[in-house]
Amino acid sequence: MKITILFLTLLVLSSSCTSIITKTMNSKETIYLDNPAVSPSIDQNLVDIHLGHSFVQGVMSFCYDCGKACFRRGKNLARCQKFVCRCTISKLR
């Protein structure tokens, strides 16, 4: 009986610790893109946006997030290569 209660107590403690750890890991990965970028000079045609992605997430998810970030700023997606996101300066029409 004591072994069963001890086992269940350890199981509950380990599952709660696991959920806390995964919650903190997921909150660190959240990226906020609502801050507007600094307006570029007139000579530039493209604006760099650094989203902070890693190779683990892959190019497809990076380019998807890149397009969403450009759309939020009211701009078109110009290029997405080598984990560099570039939006056009011209606004959406």
Swiss-Prot record:
One GO term describing the cellular component: filiform apparatus
Signal peptide: 1-19
Keywords, ordered alphabetically: Antimicrobial, Disulfide bond, Fungicide, Plant defense, Secreted, Signal
Organism superkingdom: Eukaryota
Transmembrane segments: none
Subcellular locations according to the entry: Secreted
GO biological process: one example: pollen tube guidance
Cystine residue pairs: C63-C80, C66-C85, C70-C87
Family: Belongs to the DEFL family.
Stated name of the protein: Defensin-like protein 209
Protein source organism: Arabidopsis thaliana (Mouse-ear cress)
